Amino acid sequence: MKLLFLHGLEGSPRGQKPSWLRDAGHDVIAPDLDTYDVRSHLETWFAAGRPEVTMPPAAWSIPLATAQAALSTPGIDAVVGSSFGGGLAMELVRLGLWRGPLLLLAPAGRKLFGITTVEVSRLAILHGRHDDVVPLEDSVALARDAHADATLRIVDDDHRLTASVAAGLMGELLTVLVPPMRP
């Protein structure tokens, strides 16, 4: 399966999640989203005592352009986004650039982008009940309100979802999103 993977603020194209996907046999396109401006913006907002953040588009224009360029790769079967990358994937959907299967891992779409719903063919969300970065309630509402066939998997994990990824839950959800072709 050909996947576009969009990493989080602390992630990278060579991080645990895209590496696991590659090791599982997927063709993974994982661009470096260059999140420096986003992190700087968030540090400024949090230092000013603003816990709820919806970032202005200028703060994420570079990662968005990078994601758009990667999305133009022919044959992408699904988009996978983790935290900030999940919010960025939701922005691609909001802009009408992607309508296919979408796997979101603790997505920061509402928290950082102000996006509360998506219109895609299929949606799967993996979120840890012990996440102290992105509210679990955001994913519950997204799954409930999505204009898509949605699956929400709440797991006994934290924001990084390390145990869940190691247990193969990303792969299980991808199989739900894009069922294997029958011979």
At which residue positions do the language-model features occur?
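Short beta-strand/loop motif that positions the catalytic acidic residue
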Residues: 119, 124-127, 131
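A conserved short beta-strand
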Residues: 98-110
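Short alpha-helix in the alpha/beta-hydrolase fold that links the catalytic acid
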Residues: 17-18, 135-144, 166-167
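Post-His helix in hydrolase/transferase enzymes
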Residues: 162-177
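Acidic catalytic loop of the alpha/beta-hydrolase fold
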Residues: 11-12, 129-134, 159-160
